[in-house]
């Protein structure tokens, strides 16, 4: 498949009026194909692989939050990056997952062609699925280069999305606690 992606990048360069054989571009199709495979590696991963067995029994029933998880994704409409941070919380109900696994779940879904709204929901549903928790909250704030570099060219625009499941959706106190804690330095 990488050869096909590489050939496509070569054709794009030609269609732009460039010479893909000139010194500065000679290896660009191969590098771009390799970069695209990396930036979309989430398609090659699944939840079981990402968790790698790191689900543990626990009596803890208090909120678990992982804040400021950097994320890098590609807008499915323009193939341009969006860059931001995710905050993920869940209320355990008999089990917890390894700390790094929350970040790995974010990465698995972010490393696909995405829109932020779907990314937020996919992360929440995955955390709910693996923890069986009483609730899950995901908040993402990101800057979209498709809006900054082209179109309306708004350099300071940011997009925020949230998904609240279970107690985070049904209980305003739980939701507010999460929202307050992710804003605390």
From Swiss-Prot:
Superkingdom, natural source: Bacteria
Keywords: GTP-binding, Hydrolase, Metal-binding, Nucleotide-binding, One-carbon metabolism, Zinc
GO BP terms, alphabetized: one-carbon metabolic process; tetrahydrobiopterin biosynthetic process; tetrahydrofolate biosynthetic process
Reaction equation(s) it catalyzes: GTP + H2O = 7,8-dihydroneopterin 3'-triphosphate + formate + H(+)
UniProt xrefs under InterPro entries: GTP-CH-I_C/QueF (IPR043133), GTP-CH-I_N (IPR043134), GTP_CycHdrlase_I (IPR001474), GTP_CycHdrlase_I_CS (IPR018234), GTP_CycHdrlase_I_dom (IPR020602)
A molecular function (GO) term: zinc ion binding
List of residues binding Zn(2+): 75, 78, 146
Claim: Disulfide bond is one of the keywords in the record: no
Pfam families documented for this protein: GTP_cyclohydroI
Binding partners and assembly: Toroid-shaped homodecamer, composed of two pentamers of five dimers.
Name this polypeptide is given: GTP cyclohydrolase 1
Species in which this protein is naturally found: Alkalilimnicola ehrlichii (strain ATCC BAA-1101 / DSM 17681 / MLHE-1)
Lineage, broadest ranks: Bacteria, Pseudomonadati, Pseudomonadota, Gammaproteobacteria, Chromatiales
Gene it is expressed from: folE
């Amino acid at each position: 498949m990488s050869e096909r992606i590489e050939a496509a990048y070569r054709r794009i360069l030609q269609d732009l009026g460039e010479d893909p054989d000139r010194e500065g571009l000679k290896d660009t199709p191969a590098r771009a194909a390799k970069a695209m495979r990396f930036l979309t590696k989430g398609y090659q991963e699944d939840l079981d692989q990402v968790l790698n067995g790191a689900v543990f029994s626990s009596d803890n029933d208090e909120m678990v939050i992982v804040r400021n998880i950097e994320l890098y994704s590609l807008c499915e409409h323009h193939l341009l990056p969006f860059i931001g941070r995710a905050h993920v919380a869940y209320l355990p109900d008999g089990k917890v997952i390894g700390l790094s696994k929350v970040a790995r779940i974010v990465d698995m879904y972010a490393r696909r062609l995405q829109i932020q709204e779907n990314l937020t929901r996919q992360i929440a549903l995955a955390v709910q699925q693996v923890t069986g928790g009483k609730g899950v909250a995901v908040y993402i704030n990101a800057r979209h280069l498709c809006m900054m570099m082209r179109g309306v060219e708004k350099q300071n625009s940011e997009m925020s999305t949230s998904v609240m499941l279970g107690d985070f959706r049904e209980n305003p106190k739980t939701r507010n606690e999460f929202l307050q804690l992710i804003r605390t330095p």
